[in-house]
Amino acid sequence: MAGLALREFEVLIAIPGKLNIGPHTKTLIDELVRCARAQHYLSVIVMAAALVDVLTHEGADTNFDEAAEEEGFGLSMLRVNERRALDRLRGMRNRILHYQGPSEGLSGHVSDKDYLQAQAEAAIKAILPLLELQEMY
C-alpha cells in the first residue's frame, strides 16, 4: 500500500521526538506501518482504530472519581468532518471484529481487495488530524 495517506503518515512520524506520544502509541504506529507496507488492509483498519483509542487516553491520569474533572481534550479539537471520518473508521473496525452478517469487503468477491485497500487508506487518512495534534513545536 503506497497511497498518499501512508506517505503523509510516514512524513509525520519520520522525525523522532516530533510527536508527543507514549510507548503504546509508538508501538501501534510501527505496527500500522508494517501492516500497510505488507498490504494487510484489515490489520491497518484495526490498528488505526486502536490508535484513536490510545491517543485519546494514553498519558492521561485516569481518575474514576465522579467528582473529578475531565482531563485532556480527547477528540474535541477535531473538525466535524474529521470526527465523522473517525466514526466511519470505528464502524469499519466493528464490522471486521464483530460479525453481523455479510459485509462489504469481507464477501470473498474479487473486488474485496480494492475495497479494503480504499478503506485502509481512509483509515490512515482519518487518524492524521489526531496525530497532528500530538506534534511538538
Regions found by a protein language model. Name each.
Residues V80-Y137:
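Charge-enriched, short contiguous segments at helix-coil
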Residues H24, H40-M47, A85, M92, ...:
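Residue-level detector of well-ordered alpha-helical segments, enriched
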Residues I29-A60:
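Short, hydrophobic, well-ordered secondary-structure elements
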Residues G59-G91:
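Short, charged amphipathic alpha-helical segments flanked by flexible coils
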Residues M1-H40:
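Charged alpha-helical initiation segments
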Residues E58-T62, I96-Y99:
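A short secondary-structure junction motif
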